């Protein structure tokens, strides 16, 4: 649930990834799908592209990895599960342990 909350917060808040980039690595995530989503977010960030539901979806689709994470429906679930990104750093530190 924490992994989902952090990924969802990153999807909904443009400052989400910068808040956790020094805390989390791809292998901080237990779920392979979450690792792939986070890796995609990092790639977008490194290219100075926005990180949101649409850009992550398009990137995963282009790399033919969308099905590996559960498709667009799973990305939408992630973004819908988070009411706020206020505690993203705290949650990221728990995941990183």
Where are these regions (language model features)?
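Noncatalytic partner-interaction/assembly domains of nucleic-acid and motor enzyme complexes
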Residues: 1-97
């Amino acid at each position: 649930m924490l992994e989902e909350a952090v990924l969802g917060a990153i999807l909904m808040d443009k400052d989400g990834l910068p808040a956790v980039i020094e805390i989390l690595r791809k292998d901080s995530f237990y779920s392979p799908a979450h690792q792939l989503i986070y890796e995609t977010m990092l790639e977008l960030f490194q290219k100075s592209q926005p990180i949101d539901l649409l850009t992550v979806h398009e990137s995963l689709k282009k790399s033919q990895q969308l099905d590996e994470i559960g498709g667009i429906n799973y990305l939408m679930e992630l973004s819908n599960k988070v009411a706020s990104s206020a505690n993203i750093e705290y949650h990221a530190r728990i995941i990183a342990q």
